[in-house]
From Swiss-Prot:
Family stated for the protein in its record: Belongs to the RnpA family.
Chain's gene name: rnpA
Its EC number(s): 3.1.26.5
Name of protein: Ribonuclease P protein component
Function: RNaseP catalyzes the removal of the 5'-leader sequence from pre-tRNA to produce the mature 5'-terminus. It can also cleave other RNA substrates such as 4.5S RNA. The protein component plays an auxiliary but essential role in vivo by binding to the 5'-leader sequence and broadening the substrate specificity of the ribozyme.
Catalysed reactions, semicolon-separated: Endonucleolytic cleavage of RNA, removing 5'-extranucleotides from tRNA precursor
SUBUNIT field: Consists of a catalytic RNA component (M1 or rnpB) and a protein subunit.
Gene Ontology BP term (one): tRNA 3'-end processing
A GO-annotated cellular component: ribonuclease P complex
HAMAP family according to UniProt: RNase_P
Amino acid sequence: MVKLNFSRELRLLTPIQFKNVFEQPFRASTPEITILARKNNLEHPRLGLTVAKKHLKRAHERNRIKRLVRESFRLSQHRLPAYDFVFVAKNGIGKLDNNTFAQILEKLWQRHIRLAQKS
């Protein structure tokens, strides 16, 4: 049976792990979202989240975005390549409703799957 959890081993936790992704990433982006990725030496993908106060002033808005990204990653993790992903929120992200946001995330995950197959 496939596990659809988001355990500690599926998260980027330390600044060094984030820095590693920021060095030479594959990018997939829209005006509101960028997802950076870099191959890891593990057998599973990992996710890191960055949602700045600059783009979303209120904590409940930042939490909503992070919750939606975690859920999307959790459901897509078995299709994703063994990469470290960093989600970066940009201006205008707060104006997206949940359905539109989920559709955009799905397109970005698909783009990363295609990029991984090419490399």
